[in-house]
Amino acid sequence: GPTGSGKTSTLYTTLRQLATREVNLCTVEDPIEMVEPAFNQMQVQHNIDLTFASGIRALLRQDPDIIMIGEIRDQETAEMAIQAALTGHLVFSTLHTNDAPSAISRLQELGVAHYLIKATLIGVMAQRLVRLLCSHCKRPLDQEDADGCEAVGCAQCRDSGYQGRAGLYEIMLMDPALQALVTPGADVQALRREALAQGMSSLRMAGIEKVKAGLTTMTEVLRVTPGDSETNPLFIGA
């Protein structure tokens, strides 16, 4: 997801669940955004040539079970992340992409061969943050055939109609059918169609569920999520 979509918070929460006494969990970050005693954290320092790639290379000598890379920004970091995964380590990282299937094309743009992506990628999660309706002033929509509520505004929410935020998630788990579509210059739309056929819930679909539950508005969901496809009635083309 983009900057400010909650990727770091989700990543740390996931790692905290995995960090037990038996697990050696190491991170390379720029900067270290949350100090966590259960992790072995390393900060990138360009003035001494400690980059993401060189940091991963150093961590591989420390017998880690899980490696977290703050962000994959360049080819060298991507290649080292793949190398770590190929040697039996569980690797977590973040990428700036619009949705989950686009992560595959992004890795290819960074120079990672398609067969290496097939061999190492387990899954991708895209996310966005959506504003929640204020529980003190929201009201049901007037239309009889419409589910959900609308924003009003009160002193509790400073007349914005919203209070708090929640995550929208799109999780794409790699299976043989999706792996078969990971080819040189992979078609992102073909990957998306197959993932949806396999049961993936898109960011927009996740948002619509929150609208139906009266937690947010359709306007808010359309603001933060990309369109799904031409076959979706709520598709908004670029």
Residues of each region from the PLM?
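Short, flexible helix-loop junctions that flank or precede catalytic/ligand sites
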Residues: 1-238
